[in-house]
């Protein structure tokens, strides 16, 4: 039977005018992320970007990520302004550990019903993250998909491309017994372990906005944006011989540190070298989470672990401190003995 009423895309739940309004809202913040290598602006079918001329043998490094169920917590608390920083951080931090300078970033924003204010807040956060990491936000996709997401719920994904000199790629191959390990402090749980965090909140019937921890709400602790280490690490890499860098994300200490270690080496972590930030003690105690599970799920206050020669430790910590990072020696590299794990926390 033919429908007598003329139907439009908007009747089906897709508002093209709202999408256009969003593009106009974000043009200004996107422009602030521009790099000289970027050709053209928003609106093209594809983004064009030249390689920086300073590289002799440039190798492109790419990465993609999301922010997991931290997004659900942000939506529940109606705090959308920093989730974009998280998105950029998760991508660019994975690039810089290989010595790569982030060049450009693209985002994907999908929702059941587009709320222009919410989307603009998220994308403004993405632009801020791009500025913090020195990369250009060159484009993205906003998908309004009624029936795929509940109401104004949304999901985000990020895609980043960086560049590194071929001879300066950091791949862990130089790591050897006797190397020192330096930690860089995290700003909070970053963007990992939030399904467990939300489970702990639910089981303990905790309101994160009404619960205070060290003069800040639990919500502030949990939604603190993921730290972006790009500029401080790129500066360090220029001045110090870095053997490996591990970004502590999903899988925590047990799974991320071995990703950059040769098979015959072991990372020995000195647990007494730092104190867990209060949020991790709260999570462990409230959720009755085992120590092993904490180190597997969370960063426990450590965002990056750097392997380098022991003679370079003092200089590296001085440089990182001057760059605004909190850094300390967290352990050493030893020869792996048969039957032992590649990471030991003692």
Swiss-Prot record:
Reaction catalyzed: 2-formamido-N(1)-(5-O-phospho-beta-D-ribosyl)acetamidine + ATP = 5-amino-1-(5-phospho-beta-D-ribosyl)imidazole + ADP + phosphate + H(+)
GO MF annotation terms: ATP binding; phosphoribosylamine-glycine ligase activity; phosphoribosylformylglycinamidine cyclo-ligase activity
Enzyme nomenclature, EC number: 6.3.3.1
Domain of life: Bacteria
Compartment(s): Cytoplasm
UniProt keyword annotations, A-Z: ATP-binding, Cytoplasm, Ligase, Nucleotide-binding, Purine biosynthesis
Family under the similarity heading: Belongs to the AIR synthase family.
Entries under InterPro entries matching the protein: PurM-like_C_dom, PurM-like_C_sf, PurM-like_N, PurM-like_N_sf, PurM_cligase
Top EC class, one word: ligase
Annotated metabolic or biological route of this protein: Purine metabolism; IMP biosynthesis via de novo pathway; 5-amino-1-(5-phospho-D-ribosyl)imidazole from N(2)-formyl-N(1)-(5-phospho-D-ribosyl)glycinamide: step 2/2
Gene3D superfamilies: PurM-like C-terminal domain, PurM-like, N-terminal domain
Lineage: Bacteria, Pseudomonadati, Pseudomonadota, Gammaproteobacteria, Enterobacterales
GO process terms (BP): 'de novo' IMP biosynthetic process; adenine biosynthetic process
The protein's name: Phosphoribosylformylglycinamidine cyclo-ligase
A cellular-component GO term for this protein: cytosol
